[in-house]
Amino acid sequence: MNRFEVVRWFARSLPWRMASLAALCVLAEAGIAKAPLQAQDFPAVGQASRTTQTLAGLRAPVGVYRDTLGIPHIYAKSAEDAYFALGYVHATDRLFEMEVFRRRASGTLAEVFGKASLDDDIFVRQIGIRRSAEAEWKSPRLDGRIRSELEAYCAGVNARLGELQKSGGSKLPAVFQQLGFTPAPWTPVDALAFPKYMGWDQSGTDTDVWMGMLVEKLGLETVNELFPLDRPYELPTIPGWGAVNKPLGQGVSPAPGSAGVSPALRLPPDFDQAALDLHRRFVSGRYGSKFALGSNNWVIDGIKSATGKPILASDPHLGFSLPSIWYTAHLVAPGLNITGVTFAGFPYTVIGHNDRIAWGLTDMQADAVDYFIEKTDAQHPHQYFYKGAWRALERILEEVPVRGEKPVPQEIESTIHGPLVTTHGVKLALAWTGLGPTFEVIAFQRLNTARGLADYQAALKDLAVPALNVIYADLDGNIAIAPHGALPIRKRGLGRWPVDGSSGDYDWAGTIPDEQLPFALNPTKHFLASANGRPAPVGYPYYLGWMWDPSYRTRRIHELLSKHDHITVEDMEAFQMDAHDSAAEAFVPVLLAAYDRQPFGDEQVRRAIDELRHWNFEATPQSVAERIWAEVRALPT
């Protein structure tokens, strides 16, 4: 048993300044978190409230100090104790959020919220997020260090849970009491399921299904005109593949079937029914919502910064939630000094910096999901036709608990391509590079403890889902960016719409090798940036996707970084809060010209046009023109 000390404010005497990191910053979420925090910004110990607790599971005393923003700063004598303390404070501040995400990932929402959540549970069980997490925990790929840190984190969560469950659970957050249940102990599988669920949330989409319907109804030529693969106005994250000045595609052989477009397809008569069914499931579970959001990150090197060291910004735009998806924390232990944002429920920092490196993330918006039209019939129950023969479907029987009702038996059926995910109409199998065990936990643990460029590159090898643009800086002066993830190589076609699953012609032939994914290091322009746009230019030999975000944000970041030198942290803060609407700057003049050629509408329309005509394209809260432009953009075209 050891002391667990919580101090509400920092003491002036705390000797924890990290002067060597004064120029390495991570700017995260809606606000700005700077490193290092200065001890003198906080009241002295005499002004602090202090509590000391004795908890089973700690190896030595641990101090947890909360700053004026409530951010915990954890000081421990071992990494295991640091993660124990993080689990404890996660459970203290975010227990119900953790429980909801655990149930989302495990397919047990209906156990608490009733039948309305049953289909969400069935869908996530078909994808098999928890089964994948269980396989990861059993895998020998997880070394002893990661296992001990995961177990320590869970022990910290459960220590707090045990305290809250005393007196019949009356100390639990009120929402647990209102719903009438007590959360189960936290396990390493729960922790591993969290990043897998987030990977699906950022990767999953039913766009391919709707594209298939458009191809059938409008024709291939029209669809390719409306949704072109190659848009020359886009600004790629990495204009040339590989290290700076390395020619695009050097040493890369074009992947089979990566050029051109998939042939048009004849969809089965009941395809529309299946498409509507699948879309309903996506809307219900809110998967694929990433396309309405976005993220930015950028980094400048020491030549462009005022300090002579890199400055890095990471600006994730995940959906609004209360509480926020992010949880900021600082952990210090031998071999560990990490600050950044975490997911409550998972021990490792997702975006942040240690005392040697910093990194940030944006969604790559790559295409890692395909749908296969499987051939089944009533004469061959529990079978599907593949390469000239009927094969047995893989079948898993589960029971889904439902509040107030008997558990619902659920049979999950899968083909060689993936689980069958439609309940009506044609049978569609979902292929995703995240099916089965992937090991993002290894990637994040390695990023948390990385000491330099080689460690960063090694960590990327285990970053499979979702595909991310991982931006980087270190105290040696290096800056880099790597669009990275497990991305399929298709034998034929591009997977932009559902394909025949029976022939094997459209099967995947592995994933793009790590060394052939785009990568940039120390560019001559002295900065790098990404904003969910095309990762590599037209002509890159592998198909990565097509639903890139337009380059307006990317161009604005490039504009700001290009025209400034001697950039300070304060400048970076201003860039992050920049409200210039580059999309409006491009389109509003076209709109005004069209109106001037043929005016229409009443006085209200003319007033709206006048607001747009005199707008400076700054999207401030007070801007009437910005609101008008937002309504115009939302109009169906």
What are the residue ranges of the model-derived segments?
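N-terminal secretory signal peptides that target proteins for export/translocation
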Residues: 1-14
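Bacterial N-terminal signal peptides
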Residues: 17-31
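Boundary at the C-terminal end of the N-terminal hydrophobic targeting segment
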Residues: 30-33, 37-39
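Substrate-recognition/specificity elements adjacent to catalytic centers across diverse enzyme folds
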Residues: 42-311, 316, 322, 335
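Second-shell loop/turn segments in exported
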Residues: 82-85, 134-148, 442-447, 540-547, ...
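Ordered core of a single globular domain
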Residues: 438, 451-457, 462-464, 541-637
